[in-house]
């Protein structure tokens, strides 16, 4: 899969986009082509881990082998969430379902992204024998989720900047643990 900036640019691979975050020209990266994902593969009986693989695989392409991607996803989600399958659902009635996204280690919905993002970074860093420093600036739970996800990384240092007196109470409590 190749990506380019919404403001027009050269094409980049998944690894380059992962590490860049935003395009140099200030645009957002978008895929060259949108993959077709079979909706029959996405149903209520699919685990969150399997769903993640179904959706991510076409966007990653051949930059991560299928068995390695499965391992990364399994390690990211299997031991870090209190709910089996990561996400829990509460059916109110036939037409209303509540999706609970607080089952991660910091109780923030951002755990879903961070618990996977850091192992994806690690995959490439280990192959290249490199280390990186991440700088996170936040007043909420992004920092807590990022710090928790980096705990298991041998290749990433994290520096989290919080504004004085503007940190959400829950984020502050999480940092103290």
Model-derived segments and their meaning:
Residues 1-25:
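Charged, compositionally biased N-terminal leader segments and the immediate start
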Residues 19, 53, 57, 115-118, ...:
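Predominant activation on well-ordered alpha-helical scaffold segments within soluble catalytic domains
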Residues 27-107:
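Small-residue-rich anion-binding loops in enzyme active sites
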Residues 97-152:
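Well-ordered mid-protein domain cores that form the structural environment of catalytic cofactors
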Residues 156-160:
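A glycine-rich helix N-cap at a beta->alpha junction
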Residues 161, 165-166:
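Hydrophobic, small-residue-rich alpha-helical packing segments that form membrane-like cores
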Residues 167-174:
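Conserved small/polar residues in nucleotide/adenosyl-binding loops
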């Amino acid at each position: 899969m190749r990506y380019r900036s919404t403001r027009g640019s050269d094409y980049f691979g998944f690894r380059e986009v992962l590490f860049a975050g935003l395009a140099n020209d200030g645009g957002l990266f978008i895929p060259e082509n949108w993959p077709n994902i079979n909706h029959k593969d996405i149903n209520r009986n699919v685990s969150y881990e399997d769903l993640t693989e179904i959706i991510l695989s076409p966007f990653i392409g051949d930059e991560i082998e299928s068995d390695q991607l499965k391992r990364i996803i399994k390690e990211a989600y299997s031991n870090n969430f209190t709910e089996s399958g990561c996400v829990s659902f509460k059916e109110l009635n036939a037409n209303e379902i509540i999706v609970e996204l607080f089952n991660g280690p910091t109780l923030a919905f951002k755990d879903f992204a961070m618990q996977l993002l850091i192992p994806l970074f690690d995959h490439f860093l280990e192959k290249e024998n490199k280390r990186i420093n991440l700088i996170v600036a936040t007043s909420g739970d992004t920092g807590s989720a990022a710090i928790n996800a980096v705990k298991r990384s041998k290749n990433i240092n994290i520096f989290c900047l919080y504004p004085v007196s503007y940190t959400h109470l829950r984020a502050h409590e999480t940092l103290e643990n």
